[in-house]
């Protein structure tokens, strides 16, 4: 399908997003659970941010990291899900060239920053459980500030080139994206130019960043598990295993889905098209909806903070 001219990039000035090409009649039904998860994610993360901001007793490094995670989740949800729901409910499939690449930039940036934040939070739990006496001297406000700078700097170094490389390609005639989201490879495959370098860069950068984060997370939780198994009090051991186990499972889901998406995007002809589309959407809904529960609401201090907030209302 041709589109109006865009002098800076070729002929295409807008794209059409085709969600679930093989199951378009199901879109209204799919929108119901997606809408509920979106509302849950936004409400839970906003509540967590407000609670930590208003409660001075929660102004601690661990909760600053949790605030950063909630902020990343909110931005990711708002970047992707409203457009998906607009397609489902109102058939608003078109997206401008600039809006598509803006979505791609924010999505790539915040997903890699969230992966890095999970890694820093795993280290925080490692220090808290394996070296509790040294925790106040290691995990300080200065540590959180440096960690935040590292998260942003690493993202700028490795993730920023992804949308830039795609935006520099020429898009001549085809403008139909078989996805609900402007992912790098979904868009770049429409280009008239050779995209081998784009594919190679995303594969190498994705596996380097996400793979290294996942390895460090697994190492941190391995040390944590070893320390927890040495706890003699059965109640304390069970509580620690439950808490850290839920953290690790959620992180594993986040990282594994991202790595699977990198692979499926490079092997589209051998994998049903609707699978990566569904994984992309769920990846922007399930972790944001569960993070506040797993990391926040299950924490005694956060529960007390939310209760204080509700009493004020």
Ranges and model annotations:
Residues 1-313:
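Transmembrane helical core of 7TM receptor-like proteins
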């Amino acid at each position: 399908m041709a589109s109006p001219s865009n002098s800076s990039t070729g002929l295409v000035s807008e794209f059409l997003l085709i969600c679930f090409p093989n199951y378009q009649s199901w879109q209204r039904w799919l929108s119901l659970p997606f809408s509920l998860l979106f509302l849950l994610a936004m409400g839970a993360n906003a509540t967590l941010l407000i609670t930590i901001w208003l409660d001075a007793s929660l102004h601690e490094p661990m909760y600053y990291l949790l605030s950063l995670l909630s902020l990343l989740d909110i931005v990711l949800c708002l970047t992707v899900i409203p457009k998906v729901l607009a397609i489902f409910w109102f058939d608003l499939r078109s997206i401008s060239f600039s809006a598509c690449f803006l979505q791609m930039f924010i999505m790539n940036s915040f997903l890699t920053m969230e992966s890095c934040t999970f890694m820093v939070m795993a280290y925080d739990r490692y220090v808290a459980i394996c070296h509790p006496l040294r925790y106040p001297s290691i995990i300080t406000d200065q540590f959180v500030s440096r960690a935040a700078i590292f998260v942003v700097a690493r993202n700028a170094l490795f993730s920023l080139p992804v949308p830039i490389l795609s935006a520099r390609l020429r898009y001549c005639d085809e403008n139909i994206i078989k996805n609900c989201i402007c992912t790098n490879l979904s868009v770049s495959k429409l280009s008239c130019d050779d995209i081998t370098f784009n594919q190679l860069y995303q594969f190498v950068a994705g596996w380097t960043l996400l793979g290294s984060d996942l390895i460090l997370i697994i190492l941190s939780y391995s040390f944590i598990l070893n320390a927890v198994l040495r706890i003699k009090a059965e109640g304390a051991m069970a509580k620690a295993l439950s808490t850290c186990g839920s953290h690790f499972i959620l992180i594993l889901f986040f990282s594994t889905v991202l790595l699977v998406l990198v692979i499926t995007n490079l092997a589209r002809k051998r994998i049903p098209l609707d699978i990566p589309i569904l994984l992309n959407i769920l990846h922007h809904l399930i972790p944001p909806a569960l993070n506040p529960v797993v990391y926040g609401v299950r924490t005694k201090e956060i529960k007390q903070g939310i209760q204080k907030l509700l009493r004020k209302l």
